[in-house]
């Protein structure tokens, strides 16, 4: 794509993702092609950044918060997170506990739902 202008690429180094600008569209220097499965997966994750998510955990708790990042172990960081205990717990009485910034271990995640942008249909995908 000649003349397409600079693009933002993500590069993973030592377990961390960093952005860099590139003026070529031939792929990055590691041989990862622009339409490779890894690139498509990364783009899908980028599209979810700052979206509200509901994460169900193995112990029955549910966390709702803003998706900030993930890592290679599938751990998820949520901002402005709230914790909802399982309904059978009489102490919780359905009220959320405000956590703020929360790290959810990947091996404890049962399901992840992303809140829809529009109000049509259900609130989560």
UniProtKB/Swiss-Prot annotation:
GO MF annotation, one: RNA binding
Region of interest: Disordered: 1-42
Modified positions (Phosphoserine) in chain numbering: 22, 25, 29
Name this protein carries in UniProt: N-alpha-acetyltransferase 38, NatC auxiliary subunit
Superkingdom classification of source: Eukaryota
Keywords linked to the UniProt accession: Acetylation, Cytoplasm, Nucleus, Phosphoprotein
One BP term from GO: negative regulation of apoptotic process
Classification via InterPro entries: LSM_dom_sf (IPR010920), LSMD1_Sm (IPR034110), Sm (IPR047575), Sm_dom_euk/arc (IPR001163), snRNP_SmB/NAA38-like (IPR050914)
Residue numbers bearing the N-acetylalanine modification: 2
Cellular component GO terms, alphabetical: cytoplasm; NatC complex; nucleoplasm; nucleus
Role of this protein: Auxillary component of the N-terminal acetyltransferase C (NatC) complex which catalyzes acetylation of N-terminal methionine residues. N-terminal acetylation protects proteins from ubiquitination and degradation by the N-end rule pathway.
Similarity section: Belongs to the snRNP Sm proteins family.
Extent of Low complexity compositional bias: 18-28
SMART domains linked: Sm
Gene3D superfamilies: 2.30.30.100
Subcellular location(s) of the protein: Cytoplasm; Nucleus
Source organism (scientific name): Mus musculus
Quaternary organization: Component of the N-terminal acetyltransferase C (NatC) complex, which is composed of NAA35, NAA38 and NAA30.
Gene from which the chain derives: Naa38
Pfam families cross-referenced by the UniProt entry: LSM (PF01423)
UniProt xrefs under PANTHER family: N-ALPHA-ACETYLTRANSFERASE 38, NATC AUXILIARY SUBUNIT, SMALL NUCLEAR RIBONUCLEOPROTEIN-ASSOCIATED PROTEIN B AND N
Ranges of residues in domain Sm: 40-118
């Amino acid at each position: 794509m000649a003349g397409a202008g600079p693009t933002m690429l993500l590069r993973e180094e030592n377990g961390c993702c960093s952005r860099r600008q590139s003026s070529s569209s031939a792929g990055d220097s590691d041989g990862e092609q622009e339409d490779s499965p890894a690139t498509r997966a990364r783009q899908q994750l980028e599209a979810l950044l700052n979206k509200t998510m509901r994460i169900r955990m193995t112990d029955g708790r549910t966390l709702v918060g803003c998706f900030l990042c993930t890592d290679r172990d599938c751990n998820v960081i949520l901002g402005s997170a709230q914790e909802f205990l399982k309904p059978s717990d009489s102490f919780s009485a359905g009220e959320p506990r405000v956590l703020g910034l929360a790290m959810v271990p990947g091996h404890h995640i049962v399901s992840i739902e992303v809140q829809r942008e529009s109000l049509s249909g259900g609130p989560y995908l």
